[in-house]
C-alpha cells in the first residue's frame, strides 16, 4: 500500500469529474492506497478518488472511533434526498478552513462495494453529510462551492497561507 498525495485547491484536477469504474478487480490496489491515504491524515474521515488525481469513481469513509472500519463505495450515486441540514465542514483538499454548509438531511445512495456487490445506504445522520461531501468530489466540486464568492476567496487565501 502507498500513501498518495492529496490535491489542494486551486488544483484544477479537483474539478475533473470521475468516471464509472467498469473493472473493480483492476482497482483493488488503488482502493487499498485510498484507504491508507485517508488513515495517514490526522482527522480525515472520507476521501474521494478525485482528491488524489484519479478519475475512477470511488470514495472511502470511516466514521469509527478506531479508524479501522472503512466503507468503500464504487460508482456511488445519490438517488433520493430530502430535508435540510446546516453543519460545519472541512476538507483534506482545503486544509485549515472550515465553514457552515447546507446539505440534505437524508439521502439514499446506491453503489457497489469493493467486491462489486450492489449496496444501498439510506441515512439521516452524519454519514449523510459525509456521503454528499465525498460524492460532490466525484462531480468535480469542493464544499466551498456551496458558499458565497467572498467565503470561497477567504478559503483560498487560508490554503495558500497554510501551504
UniProtKB/Swiss-Prot annotation:
SUPFAM superfamilies reported in the protein's UniProt record: Peptide deformylase
Single Gene Ontology MF annotation: metal ion binding
Cofactor binding: number and manner: Binds 1 Fe(2+) ion.
One Pfam family hit: Pep_deformylase
Catalytic residue positions: 134
UniProt keyword annotation of Metal-binding present: yes
EC numbers on record: 3.5.1.88
Annotated binding of Fe cation, by residue: 91, 133, 137
GO BP of this protein: co-translational protein modification; translation
CDD domains: Pep_deformylase (cd00487)
NCBIfam families assigned: pept_deformyl, PRK00150.1-3
Family: Belongs to the polypeptide deformylase family.
HAMAP family: Pep_deformylase
Role: Removes the formyl group from the N-terminal Met of newly synthesized proteins. Requires at least a dipeptide for an efficient rate of reaction. N-terminal L-methionine is a prerequisite for activity but the enzyme has broad specificity at other positions.
Protein name: Peptide deformylase 3
Amino acid at each position: 500500500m502507498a500513501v498518495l498525495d492529496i490535491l489542494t485547491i486551486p488544483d484544477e484536477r479537483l474539478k475533473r469529474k470521475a468516471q464509472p469504474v467498469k473493472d473493480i478487480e483492476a482497482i483493488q490496489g488503488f482502493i487499498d492506497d485510498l484507504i491508507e491515504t485517508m488513515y495517514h491524515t490526522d482527522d480525515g474521515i472520507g476521501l474521494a478518488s478525485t482528491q488524489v488525481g484519479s478519475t475512477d469513481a470511488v470514495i472511502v469513509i470511516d466514521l469509527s472511533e478506531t479508524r479501522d472500519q472503512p466503507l468503500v463505495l464504487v460508482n456511488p450515486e445519490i438517488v433520493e434526498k430530502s430535508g435540510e441540514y446546516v453543519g460545519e465542514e472541512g476538507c483534506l483538499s482545503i486544509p485549515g478552513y472550515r465553514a457552515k454548509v447546507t446539505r440534505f438531511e437524508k439521502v439514499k445512495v446506491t453503489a457497489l462495494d469493493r467486491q462489486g456487490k450492489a449496496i444501498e445506504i439510506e441515512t439521516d445522520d452524519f454519514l449523510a453529510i459525509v456521503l454528499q461531501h465525498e460524492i460532490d468530489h466525484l462531480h468535480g466540486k469542493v464544499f466551498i462551492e456551496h458558499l458565497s464568492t467572498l467565503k470561497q476567496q477567504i478559503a483560498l487565501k487560508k490554503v495558500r497561507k497554510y501551504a
